[in-house]
Every structure is written in C-alpha cells, then in structure tokens.
Amino acid sequence: ILEAEADTITDFVSGNDLLDLVSISGDNLGTYVEANGAANDFAAYTANATTSFSGNAIDIYVEYNLNGAGNTYFIADEDKSGNVSAGDTLIILSGLSSADAIDSSDII
C-alpha cells in the first residue's frame, strides 16, 4: 500500500465519529495498537504495523504525529495477511497529532 493511496479525513473527532470496518468486511476486529510516531517515517510506520499484525484478524495499527508532521496514520489489516499490503485500509487523520486523536472505541 502506498501513502499516496491513503484516504484522508480532515474533520475526525474522537468520541463523536466512528470508523466502521465491520460492516464493510463482515468480520470481527482483532487487536488495536497505538504508538507515538513522531520519530518515524512512512517506511518505519509500515514496518511497525506489520510487526503488530497477527495475520488472523483485522488488526489495527495507529501512530499519531507520524514523522512529527501532526497527522495520525491508521491502518487495518483487512486481508488478514499479517503484512501491510494492497488489501489493507490506510487512513490519514489530518491535523490530529496526540494520543487522544483516536481511541479503540472509535472503531467498530
């Protein structure tokens, strides 16, 4: 998956908005991992996401403030491959740079 192919959300509000993956995939969600990405570029982000994916469920990996640019990156292993790949969903939450930018309860 390429960074340029990501969907971008500019007005996401944690606690008010939801990312609905279950109705799209018809499957249950797996683990949710969140980390500070201030020191990471996109390659490091995807490597960290792959490390966190089990390959058995739709696992989710989030890094806030990726590369210190003030955006939160969200990826879901929708194809359950255990790797970041073209079958996954990548979303950039623009302007959200802190740990409270998104919570696991925002994902259904």
Please report, for each region that a protein language model flagged, where it lies by residue.
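Acidic glycine/aspartate-rich repeat arrays in secreted/surface proteins
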Residues: 1-108
